[in-house]
């Protein structure tokens, strides 16, 4: 339709009735009448609107719209309308759910916030806002036409009207959408691992705009790095410094776990780096997967800068060890027996 066509100027479709023609002209006249619009180009545009209005009224008076034939209406009523199709189900939405080692170990409920896209409150989701005063289209300078090669075509920016009554919404920048935070409470099973997926059925309201069933929210578990623990499958591994004397003496050793403290029995006799392994005491089992083992790497530590009292006690212990060297320190005894007896002392 040409931008100079009377129907186009008044924003009407071909075949519009007298009432529609008058209503369209009154609406546009309120906007473009020189007494209401200070734009210098408003006078010429108003003249074009009046001319289009008069042409359409004259045409309508000569050729009024024909009334619908009765048999046509009956035929239309006789055709049953097909049932409306059910709106499609919304697509599933995927997000990452970051958990601490303690949260994944014990399970429970965790608050999770997601950002939904909702219709912009400023423009109602249209992406446009109505201008307080219409203005000439800057692309076609109010003519409604632009040159395309050797011909003139309707201006796409103003739909051939020559003026703009709307502009992109300043709040959503024309997208029609806004972001809104929504909080969910997600149940976390005990023993979830990095990469596991949790499905929250029907929780993706962001996909439920067409009236169909909302999609699911799928949360991929991401375990945050921990300063103490690491995982090998479901085996829970940690290193624990221990006094070398405690490793010699043995006894109970407190071990921190994600859900509390557990006391392990430490066998006496060796002050070397070694591992304690407790089957089933690691990460909890889930489904068909069994619980892992707790693996504690014990690292012996000697005292730094011992005071006089500790040195005296150590001297007593060392003297007694020297008396039973072959029993308690066999490596030292064999070495001294091999290399010391026949070597004369030097001054």
Swiss-Prot record:
Its cofactor is Zn(2+). Zn(2+) 2 binds at residues 137, 140, 155, 158. Its main location: cytoplasm. Gene3D superfamilies: 6.20.20.10, DnaJ domain, Urease metallochaperone UreE, N-terminal domain. HAMAP family: DnaJ. PANTHER family: DNAJ HOMOLOG 1, MITOCHONDRIAL-RELATED. Participates actively in the response to hyperosmotic and heat shock by preventing the aggregation of stress-denatured proteins and by disaggregating proteins, also in an autonomous, DnaK-independent fashion. Unfolded proteins bind initially to DnaJ; upon interaction with the DnaJ-bound protein, DnaK hydrolyzes its bound ATP, resulting in the formation of a stable complex. GrpE releases ADP from DnaK; ATP binding to DnaK triggers the release of the substrate protein, thus completing the reaction cycle. This is Chaperone protein DnaJ 1. The gene is dnaJ1.
